[in-house]
């Protein structure tokens, strides 16, 4: 047991690590194109940070948080998501708004491990604070679509979107939704029965098959939009159409957290079944004020890196090395100096010291080297090196004095 990873965690090695870093690099680059600034919060916060923001009706609060008491008796929680911590950061640091923040890192939830879902997972997270205009929603959804295009998976993913309306809309909707579900209270799942008194909208998010039958005939929130809510949502749909981003209005989409209002959306792929969201987010205009900050309209979304890793066809094995093959003691000693020079000039260098030349060249090939630099006492005396292009098999003698230029000319690196 001691030599196994904890259930729901995963080691990242070799190809998986390169795929992981590739996703982060693209997210960093795209975030800059849209004017997002980097922000990083600790992986744990005071538990109160999440209790205040996520709502006592959420699965995260009730079932999934990793919470413990530190030696000072303070209740601490490993972050289960980013938004609560970013809101804490915004309020504590008194950041000037409007502002766009991008963050990435690990998060933790105690849930059943499955394809693309771990108990320790990594997210890319985008938040926009201080913009009430629906154009912020359109731009953020466009950014998410841009990322999927960069990952070359946009054709396999569909955008589902809904509006929860403003607080007046939600209040009117609850007045009809609660009586509807109460008629079927004994037939609802245990989770949905608990949600009926805490946050009945969350029942619409149930994946239970019996619940789905009841939900299918539930009243639609769109019938209770205020004029302002309806206009806001229509502007978003029109904006997405103008950007050629297809979407499907899903009137049952509410998202899993209690703080959302107006826009909620998910980019969904069937490969992950009932838990098929690759990116998900929405608007939360009242969240900052609920934790003691000023009223700050906001919208954000997050995506799980492990999920994206399951979908992309990225097989880069990192930079291909240049392999040094010294022959003889003097050449072996010189190889250290040569390797240092090449690395200082930005080249990835490995050594092959042991065995016959044929075996060492075989190992260089197995290491996917793009070239081998072969040298012994004779080459050291004439200040030359033999370079072999491992792809073409071509060999040539190059001058040591101009080594970087000669390597570039030979390999076009």
UniProtKB/Swiss-Prot annotation:
Signal peptide (residue range): none
EC class name: ligase
Catalytic activity of the protein: tRNA(His) + L-histidine + ATP = L-histidyl-tRNA(His) + AMP + diphosphate + H(+)
Source species, domain of life: Bacteria
Gene Ontology CC terms: cytoplasm
Sorted UniProt keywords: Aminoacyl-tRNA synthetase, ATP-binding, Cytoplasm, Ligase, Nucleotide-binding, Protein biosynthesis
Listed GO MF terms: ATP binding; histidine-tRNA ligase activity
Pfam families (alphabetical): HGTP_anticodon (PF03129), tRNA-synt_His (PF13393)
PANTHER family for this protein: HISTIDINE--TRNA LIGASE, MITOCHONDRIAL-RELATED (PTHR43707:SF1), HISTIDYL-TRNA SYNTHETASE (PTHR43707)
Family that this chain belongs to: Belongs to the class-II aminoacyl-tRNA synthetase family.
Protein name: Histidine--tRNA ligase
């Amino acid at each position: 047991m001691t030599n196994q990873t904890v259930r729901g965690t995963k080691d990242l090695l070799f190809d998986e690590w390169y795929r992981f870093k590739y996703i982060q690099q693209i997210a960093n680059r795209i975030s800059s194109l849209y004017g997002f600034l980097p922000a990083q919060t600790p992986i744990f916060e005071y538990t109160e940070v999440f209790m205040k923001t996520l709502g006592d009706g959420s699965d995260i609060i009730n079932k999934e948080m990793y919470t413990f008491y530190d030696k000072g008796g303070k209740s601490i929680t490993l972050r289960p998501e980013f938004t609560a911590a970013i809101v804490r950061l915004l309020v504590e640091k008194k950041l000037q708004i409007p502002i766009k923040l991008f963050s990435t890192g690990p998060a933790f939830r105690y849930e059943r491990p499955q394809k693309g879902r771990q108990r320790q997972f990594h997210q890319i997270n985008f938040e926009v604070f201080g913009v009430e205009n629906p154009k912020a929603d359109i731009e953020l959804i466009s950014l998410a679509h841009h990322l999927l295009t960069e990952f070359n998976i946009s054709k396999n993913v569909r955008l589902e979107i809904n509006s929860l309306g403003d607080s007046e809309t939600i209040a009117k909707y609850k007045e009809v939704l609660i009586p509807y579900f109460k008629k079927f209270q004994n037939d609802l799942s245990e989770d949905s029965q608990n949600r009926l008194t805490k946050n009945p909208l969350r029942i619409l998010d149930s994946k239970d098959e019996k619940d789905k039958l009841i939900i299918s005939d539930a009243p639609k929130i769109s019938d209770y939009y205020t004029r302002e809510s309806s206009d806001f949502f229509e502007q978003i749909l029109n904006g997405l159409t103008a950007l050629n981003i297809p979407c499907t209005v899903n009137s049952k989409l509410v998202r899993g957290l209690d703080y959302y209002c107006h826009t909620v959306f998910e980019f969904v792929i069937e490969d992950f079944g009932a838990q098929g969201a690759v990116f998900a987010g929405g608007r939360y205009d009242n969240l900052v004020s609920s934790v003691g900050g000023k009223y700050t309209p906001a919208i954000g979304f997050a995506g799980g890196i492990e999920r994206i890793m399951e979908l992309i066809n990225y097989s880069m094995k990192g930079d291909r090395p240049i392999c040094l093959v010294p022959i003889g003691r003097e050449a072996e000693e010189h190889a250290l100096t040569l390797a240092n020079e090449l690395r200082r000039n930005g080249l990835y260098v490995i050594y092959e010291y042991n065995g016959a030349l044929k075996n060492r060249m075989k190992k260089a090939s197995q290491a996917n080297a793009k070239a081998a630099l072969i040298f012994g006492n004779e080459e050291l005396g004439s200040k030359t090196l033999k370079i072999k292009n491992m792809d073409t098999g071509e060999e040539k003698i190059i001058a040591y004095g101009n080594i970087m230029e000669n390597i570039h000319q030979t390999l076009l690196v």
